Every structure is written in C-alpha cells, then in structure tokens.
Amino acid sequence: YDLVGIFLETNSDKVDFRLRMQDFSADTHRRGVPWLGMPIHDLSTLDRILIIGSFLRKDHPLLAARIRQAVKRGAKVSVVHCSDDDLLMPVSAKSIVKPSQLPAALAKIAVALARHKDVVVPEAFARIEPSESDFFMAKSMASGANGAIFLGNFAVNHPAFSELQATAQWIAQILGAKLG
C-alpha cells in the first residue's frame, strides 16, 4: 500500500519491473507481459529443455525442481551459459562460453537446428558455422515432441538480450517448442 501511495503522491503511473535489464531494444515488438510460456505444473511433462543463461537452482528453485522431475521421467536438458553451474541433474549437452559470446553460441545452435530440419537460415546467420557439439545439441532438441526454451535471469540482463530473445524465439518456432 505504501508504494501505491508514493506513486499517487508523485502523480506517476509508470512502474517498471525490469530492474537489472540493460537491453530494451525489443520493447517495441513485445506484446503483453513476459511469462514462462506454460503453467508451472507442465514443466515436469517436458521431454526436451534448452536453458539459456540461467543459474537455475539459485534464481528459480521451483522451476529447477520441476525440471529435475522431467529429467527423472526421461527429459533431455541442454544448457547454453557462461558458467558451468551444477544443476544437480544429468545434462545432455552444454555450451559454456564467455558472456560476450552467448549470442553467437545460441546462433550456432540455431543454424545447426535449421540445417538439421532443412529450414532456410536467415541472412544474419548466413556466415555462421556450427560445431559438432552445436549439431549434437540441435539434434537432441529436435528429437523431442514436447520441448521448451527458457531464458534465465543472466540472459534477460545480458546487454544483447534482444538478440538472445529473437534467436530463442526462432529456435522455438522451428521446434514447435514453448518459450519462456
């Protein structure tokens, strides 16, 4: 109630929830409020999960528990991050890179997936050459029927978040996966 009073007293109607976010360039394309892309209870039914830029256990312990349940049921988890964080679950593929290389690492996986699925690669990605590990991760993600891609706090607060989000959205479209 006190916070509402402060806003009323200052005649402000602007409240921003993106406290640590650095890249706002995608705001003109965003509609609605960012969300998980599915109800929380559906996380344990996923069979393929791509986690991008997240200290999952620290930032989202409830989601980590649900994803561990999914892994116990046979889900495959892939991670693209700049820290080799222990998720306390088996991870089928990892791409651990410098923070500045996070968008490029995700783009390589996107190109590998597009080539695997015979999808035309956008011109922005035309010169990207994925590695064998990128193809492995792409094939793993493509082999599932119920997948999701999650952008963690590190990705959301990354200086190139709009690029990460656009690439993740493209991957989700190719896979028919949910994005959150």
Predicted regions mapped to residue ranges:
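Catalytic alpha/large subunits of respiratory electron-transfer oxidoreductases
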Residues: 1-180
